[in-house]
Amino acid sequence: MVWAKVETGNGAFSSQMETCSPSDAESWWFLPYDQLNLDLLPVQDSIGIILIESEKQAKRRPYHKQKLCYILSNMRHFALETLSKAIPVVYVTTNEQYDEPLRKLAQDFGPMNMFRAAERELRLTLSELIIEGHILEHPHPGWLTPQDWFTETVGNEPPFRMDRFYRRVRKEKGWLMEGDSPVGGKFSHDADNRQPWKGEHQPPQAPSYTIDEIDEEVIALVNHRFAEHPGEARLNHLPTSYKDHRQALEFLSEILTLFGPYEDAMTKESRGLFHSRLASSVNIHRVLPEEIIDVVVKADVPLNSQEGYLRQMIWREYVHHVHEITDGFHSLDIHSTVPFNRTAGWPMNVDQDKSKHPNHLNQTRSLPMAFWGQTSGMDCLDWAVESVMDEAWTHHIPRLMVLSNLAQLMDIEPRQLTDWFRAAFVDAFDWVVEPNVLGMGTFALGDAMMTKPYVSGTPYIKKMGDFCSSCKFHPTKSCPISPMYWAYFERHKEAFTGNHRLAMTLRTSQKRSDEKKANDMETFLHVTETLSKGKSLHAQKTLFSNE
């Protein structure tokens, strides 16, 4: 068996690959697209690595071109880096799913080893091969916490809450601990991490990376084979080689001091502010999570920045456990619906999954093209979407409090929003995007993960960002977001009745005059219908009043 050439002729990548046979290694490991690190392996002697590019998987949904470039270039760089260590590599390209070439490889290579796939989707694809013994599945060493830590502190069934798990992990690992007590006397410093950015500290420039011949070849391939996908094929701001990912890790030290206080801030002056942009590296294991945490806990920086970043890393473990223990939420007894389509509205033909997905509030509107780059007229939304279309990324507050918030207020079908995040963001995989969007960004899971929905009106966005100053809508006189906020609670008041966390909000909603309630609903309908037609919003005297 020899690896398959990625391009006909002697391309930059194919010309550097070597042929190999089953006898070149005593054991062979299949490493998927998100396990690209030899340090995951128990040993590196007498092993061989199998990597597979699946065009069918890449066309399963409308992935951003930069996400495709990122995955493919990292796989190819990793293959060459592995070869440089005298470890044989079988590199297969296929227009089938991963299981077909693996089944063929098993005929020559025998049973192949594999760490348990992080993504449920990949586990389902490979399940028959595992049952048949063609793949020998091992625990995934990339996770920092065993599942029993989760079940012993959180449980096997909802409601799932993070706090006890977070404390257990801190104590077990000794991260920012003095004996059994947290450094600083408390586990959470979240209250210190809510400052808006007013320009008082200049954020560093995001890392940029040299484009090499492997990157160039991948960019050309993506433009040729995936022309119908959204976004622009670029890699200058994404790490692809081992050296690039070391540079990405070094950037963490540059931003960590001010990460905490400005963790929730947004500004048109800087997309990243003091965020590390490391999620894309760690989610494919080019940088290991323990490497990141080691930098954080040893850093000489304010405690609120250390604890805030550590909390993000433990949240990553937490959502993985939630997703796995609920079988991707398929085992939960929650009202579910079948999405209209699985492309989040992007004009592309894909195999349509007809299964039901959580939709606690029965939200059924289609995602508007404003999420794919058409101008909405709201500066906060247009800024966030522009960042996604340009870089396949924003930090977590625009994701939660702009993109997800506005989708919730517009009653967008939750699975469509989830599909959009998964396709559009370079760091999105099912185990992380589904809990974050279905469980937190929307209220699709009910109170399974959150006690109340994360929604806000104009005041929060005005406080934590600077979009209102340049927006056509006045924040208190004509912005549609606050009327939509109140319309949301009026529409779904029955679903929230009895929720003590929302008691004050519901009382305030009930006290609004009939005239205001009518304006709220009219605003909601005008915004959703205008955006559904691909049009931009304009300020109107009779609508959007917050007074």
What are these regions (language model features)?
Residues 2-90:
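N-terminal beta-strand-loop-alpha-helix module at the start
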Residues 4, 20-22, 32-33, 265, ...:
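C-terminal catalytic domain of photolyase/cryptochrome flavoproteins
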Residues 11, 23, 97-238, 438:
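Beta-rich, aromatic/charged-enriched effector core domains that present basic-aromatic interfaces
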Residues 13-17, 31-39, 99-105, 125, ...:
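Short alpha-helical segments and helix-capping/turn motifs at coil-helix boundaries
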Residues 35-37, 56-57, 119-120, 142-143, ...:
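Short, solvent-exposed loop/turn segments at secondary-structure junctions
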Residues 49-56, 77-80, 118-128, 135-180, ...:
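Alpha-helical membrane-anchoring segments
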Residues 57, 172-283, 477, 481-482, ...:
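A eukaryotic "domain-start" boundary segment
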Residues 90-98:
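Short beta->alpha junction loops
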